[in-house]
């Protein structure tokens, strides 16, 4: 069976944006104009097709990436919806991994928001080419050129407008296309799908010429050939301009900018034309890196030939079909009814039904080809980030990095009967979301759930109730503290026990040294002359790692330490792995007590946008929460305060901020780094932990 859309004509794109920049509306309009959905869904009434989980409808924010297939001018566009809320950056990371290009949506009034910076950084990390759509041009305060400046100054990118707006706010009529030098005007609001090409209005001619010159300059820098032509005073042809824009976009040296208002249906068709013209096909982006089990690196090219290789990037539980695993195929093809090999887990998987999703309608298909995205029903062992491959070529594609959770709460089912239902629900949710963890507190026996922020955990508890009908009582949020050491020490420890018959003997000298924040744990074997036999060294490492689980101050995990074993002794008969493990573990604990152990806490980067009248109150409150104000800025008449605050002091912040500013301030918060806890606070924590 051959593919219906050639690889060259496939586009895998994501729509990335800050909350309320109009991302879901833009996705909806794309589906509308590509003819897939007949009635446009509005986020305001909670009816958008892309937002298909209950909580999103209520909160009006997009949480899970649904992958949707649509068609525009004989191209297949696979649209991956990315969430804009900061607690869901893991979802964004995950979708960035499988995108080839992105449309970054900015609000013409709000411009570059803190979350836009996070998403932009992630797109840079994965080298995703993008085009910018400045949305909401009909709103009061709309300013296309401000957004252009912010992209240049705050995101350090090189924005190149391919359009400039005709009017703004209530007078927004359309755009001037700088490539063709025509005005595209939407004359009749009742027929949003129709626009007319006209001559450029006289009052905008000069501005259009100025911006076209800037565009041509940027385009000419994408190749020596175009540069020569441009410097020689020759006109660039339409074809050359388009080729230059695409080359600049793919090399990330320019970011093409367009504008419109998705809500009023203006500017969406030209945006789709730009997606097709300037964003890459799967075979135009860098090959994806992979490796074999023995560590040999290999590069996997997007092509129909060759053995199958794909990445599972999302797991969802669908009420009708059960578990869906979303897969991006990089090479070869995946057929329903066949087998694939999970090379990450070393297990064979049977491929049941294959579905292409249209936000929440499904189409059953027989084959997924290279470059395509679809969902597989019924995989048993495959989790997010696993590679599926052919048994003949067991490649493992790049692994994804998932952050460690920073906040935990204890949950208990309201009735004992729900205990098992709750465990099943939490395990399913943990399979879908690698940044969410479930564990059991060994002392209290309580179930602990951990995630990336308060909202993240609220939504998990909410989903338990809605999807699994489990009502849960939620405890007080707990912060994920850590411990570390501040000075280097050397520690000897001898573990010797004689209890009739064979004894136990392990003897080590350890050097403990603090490392830079974020370095984790490093183990060095510096044993000379076999004073501790080689086979016992892994046991020493293991003993230290076990001791790291419970720090000496308050039992929190220890990080950022380097431990060197440099001397010791052993006994021919009595030494064992167990003895060395215990010697290392106890030796580390004794050493840590002398090494200036301190407690670390997660610091959040908090950005508050507030009207000036409330600025004093907001800053005063952040100081009370042990926050350090880092910078102050202005945006759209409001003050922007950036601060680093301990997570422990930020619980319930949204309610407090609302009451301080009569609901007029907004904030965003994301984990930034770990920092030492002040002595008085540390004493409190230790007292509480050690009872």
Swiss-Prot record:
<protein>
    <recommendedName>
        <fullName>Elongation factor G</fullName>
    </recommendedName>
</protein>
<dbReference type="InterPro" id="IPR009022">
    <property type="entry name" value="EFG_III"/>
</dbReference>
<dbReference type="Pfam" id="PF14492">
    <property type="entry name" value="EFG_III"/>
</dbReference>
<feature type="binding site">
    <location>
        <begin position="135"/>
        <end position="138"/>
    </location>
    <ligand>
        <name>GTP</name>
    </ligand>
</feature>
<dbReference type="GO" id="GO:0003924">
    <property type="term" value="F:GTPase activity"/>
</dbReference>
<dbReference type="InterPro" id="IPR035647">
    <property type="entry name" value="EFG_III/V"/>
</dbReference>
<dbReference type="GO" id="GO:0005525">
    <property type="term" value="F:GTP binding"/>
</dbReference>
<dbReference type="Pfam" id="PF00679">
    <property type="entry name" value="EFG_C"/>
</dbReference>
<dbReference type="Pfam" id="PF00009">
    <property type="entry name" value="GTP_EFTU"/>
</dbReference>
<dbReference type="Pfam" id="PF22042">
    <property type="entry name" value="EF-G_D2"/>
</dbReference>
<keyword id="KW-0342">GTP-binding</keyword>
<dbReference type="InterPro" id="IPR005225">
    <property type="entry name" value="Small_GTP-bd"/>
</dbReference>
<dbReference type="InterPro" id="IPR000795">
    <property type="entry name" value="T_Tr_GTP-bd_dom"/>
</dbReference>
<dbReference type="InterPro" id="IPR000640">
    <property type="entry name" value="EFG_V-like"/>
</dbReference>
<dbReference type="InterPro" id="IPR027417">
    <property type="entry name" value="P-loop_NTPase"/>
</dbReference>
<feature type="binding site">
    <location>
        <begin position="17"/>
        <end position="24"/>
    </location>
    <ligand>
        <name>GTP</name>
    </ligand>
</feature>
<dbReference type="InterPro" id="IPR031157">
    <property type="entry name" value="G_TR_CS"/>
</dbReference>
<feature type="binding site">
    <location>
        <begin position="81"/>
        <end position="85"/>
    </location>
    <ligand>
        <name>GTP</name>
    </ligand>
</feature>
<keyword id="KW-0963">Cytoplasm</keyword>
<keyword id="KW-0251">Elongation factor</keyword>
<dbReference type="InterPro" id="IPR005517">
    <property type="entry name" value="Transl_elong_EFG/EF2_IV"/>
</dbReference>
<dbReference type="GO" id="GO:0003746">
    <property type="term" value="F:translation elongation factor activity"/>
</dbReference>
<dbReference type="InterPro" id="IPR004540">
    <property type="entry name" value="Transl_elong_EFG/EF2"/>
</dbReference>
<dbReference type="InterPro" id="IPR014721">
    <property type="entry name" value="Ribsml_uS5_D2-typ_fold_subgr"/>
</dbReference>
<keyword id="KW-0547">Nucleotide-binding</keyword>
<dbReference type="Pfam" id="PF03764">
    <property type="entry name" value="EFG_IV"/>
</dbReference>
<dbReference type="GO" id="GO:0032790">
    <property type="term" value="P:ribosome disassembly"/>
</dbReference>
<dbReference type="InterPro" id="IPR035649">
    <property type="entry name" value="EFG_V"/>
</dbReference>
<comment type="function">
    <text>Catalyzes the GTP-dependent ribosomal translocation step during translation elongation. During this step, the ribosome changes from the pre-translocational (PRE) to the post-translocational (POST) state as the newly formed A-site-bound peptidyl-tRNA and P-site-bound deacylated tRNA move to the P and E sites, respectively. Catalyzes the coordinated movement of the two tRNA molecules, the mRNA and conformational changes in the ribosome.</text>
</comment>
<dbReference type="InterPro" id="IPR047872">
    <property type="entry name" value="EFG_IV"/>
</dbReference>
<dbReference type="GO" id="GO:0005737">
    <property type="term" value="C:cytoplasm"/>
</dbReference>
<comment type="similarity">
    <text>Belongs to the TRAFAC class translation factor GTPase superfamily. Classic translation factor GTPase family. EF-G/EF-2 subfamily.</text>
</comment>
<dbReference type="InterPro" id="IPR020568">
    <property type="entry name" value="Ribosomal_Su5_D2-typ_SF"/>
</dbReference>
<dbReference type="InterPro" id="IPR053905">
    <property type="entry name" value="EF-G-like_DII"/>
</dbReference>
<keyword id="KW-0648">Protein biosynthesis</keyword>
<dbReference type="InterPro" id="IPR009000">
    <property type="entry name" value="Transl_B-barrel_sf"/>
</dbReference>
<dbReference type="InterPro" id="IPR041095">
    <property type="entry name" value="EFG_II"/>
</dbReference>
<feature type="domain" description="tr-type G">
    <location>
        <begin position="8"/>
        <end position="283"/>
    </location>
</feature>
């Amino acid at each position: 069976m051959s593919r219906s859309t050639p690889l060259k004509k496939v586009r895998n794109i994501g729509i990335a944006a800050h909350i309320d920049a109009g991302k879901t509306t833009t996705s909806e309009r794309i589906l509308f104009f590509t003819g897939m959905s007949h009635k446009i869904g509005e986020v305001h009434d909670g009816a958008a097709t892309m937002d298909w989980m209950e909580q999103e409808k209520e909160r009006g924010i997009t949480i899970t990436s649904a992958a949707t297939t649509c068609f525009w001018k004989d191209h297949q566009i696979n649209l991956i919806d990315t969430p804009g809320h900061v607690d869901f950056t893991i979802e964004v990371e995950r979708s960035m991994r499988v995108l080839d290009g992105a449309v970054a949506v900015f609000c013409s009034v709000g411009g570059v928001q803190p979350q836009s910076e996070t998403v932009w950084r992630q797109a840079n990390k994965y080298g995703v080419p993008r085009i910018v759509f400045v949305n909401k041009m009909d709103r009061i305060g709309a300013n296309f050129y401000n957004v252009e400046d912010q992209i240049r100054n705050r995101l350090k990118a090189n924005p190149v407008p391919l359009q400039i707006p005709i009017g703004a706010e209530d007078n927004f009529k359309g755009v001037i296309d700088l490539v063709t030098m025509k005005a595209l005007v939407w004359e009749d609001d009742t027929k949003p799908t129709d626009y007319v090409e006209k001559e450029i209005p006289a009052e905008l001619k000069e501005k259009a010429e100025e911006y076209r010159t800037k565009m041509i300059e940027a385009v000419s820098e994408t190749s020596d050939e175009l540069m020569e032509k441009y410097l020689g005073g020759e006109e660039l042809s339409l074809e050359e301009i388009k080729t230059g824009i695409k080359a600049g976009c793919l090399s990330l040296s320019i970011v093409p900018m367009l504008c419109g208002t998705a809500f009023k249906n203006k500017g969406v068709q030209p945006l789709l034309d730009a997606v097709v013209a300037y964003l890459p096909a799967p075979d135009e982006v860098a090959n994806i890196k992979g490796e074999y089990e023995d560590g040999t690196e290999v590069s996997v090219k997007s092509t129909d030939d060759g053995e199958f290789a794909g990445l599972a990037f999302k797991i969802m539980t669908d009420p009708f079909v059960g578990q869906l695993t979303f897969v991006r195929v990089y090479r070869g093809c995946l057929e329903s009814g066949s087998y694939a090999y999970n090379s990450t887990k070393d297990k064979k998987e049977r491929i049941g039904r294959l579905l292409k999703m249209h936000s929440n309608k499904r189409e059953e298909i027989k084959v997924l080809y290279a470059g395509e995205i679809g969902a597989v029903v019924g995989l048993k062992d495959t989790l997010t980030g696993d590679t599926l491959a052919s048994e003949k070529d067991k490649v493992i594609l790049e692994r994804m990095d998932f952050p460690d959770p920073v906040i935990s709460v204890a949950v208990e089912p309201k009735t004992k009967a729900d205990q098992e239902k709750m465990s099943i629900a939490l395990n399913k949710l943990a399979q879908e979301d690698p940044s969410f963890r479930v564990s059991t507190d060994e002392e209290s026996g309580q179930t602990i759930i951990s995630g990336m922020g308060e909202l993240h955990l609220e939504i998990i508890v909410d989903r338990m109730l809605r999807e699994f009908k489990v009502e849960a009582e939620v405890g007080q949020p707990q912060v994920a503290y850590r411990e570390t050491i501040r000075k280097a020490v050397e520690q000897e420890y001898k573990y010797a026990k004689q209890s009739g018959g064979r004894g136990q003997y392990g003897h080590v000298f350890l050097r403990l040294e603090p490392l830079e924040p974020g370095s984790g744990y490093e183990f060095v074997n510096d044993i000379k002359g076999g004073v501790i036999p080689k086979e016992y060294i892994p046991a020493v490492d293991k003993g230290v790692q076990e001791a790291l689980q419970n720090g000496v101050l308050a039992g929190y995990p220890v990080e950022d330490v380097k431990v060197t074993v440099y001397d010791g002794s052993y006994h021919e008969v009595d030494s064992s792995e167990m003895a060395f493990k215990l010697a290392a573990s106890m030796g580390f604990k004794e050493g840590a007590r002398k090494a200036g152990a301190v407690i670390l806490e997660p610091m959040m980067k908090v950005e508050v946008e507030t009207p000036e009248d409330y600025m004093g109150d907001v800053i005063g409150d952040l100081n009370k929460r042990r926050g350090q104000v880092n910078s102050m800025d202005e945006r759209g008449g409001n003050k922007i305060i950036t601060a680093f605050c301990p997570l422990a002091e930020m619980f319930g912040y949204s309610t407090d901020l609302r009451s301080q500013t009569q609901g007029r301030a907004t904030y965003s918060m994301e984990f930034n780094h770990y920092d030492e806890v002040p002595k008085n606070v540390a004493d409190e924590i230790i007292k509480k932990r050690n009872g």
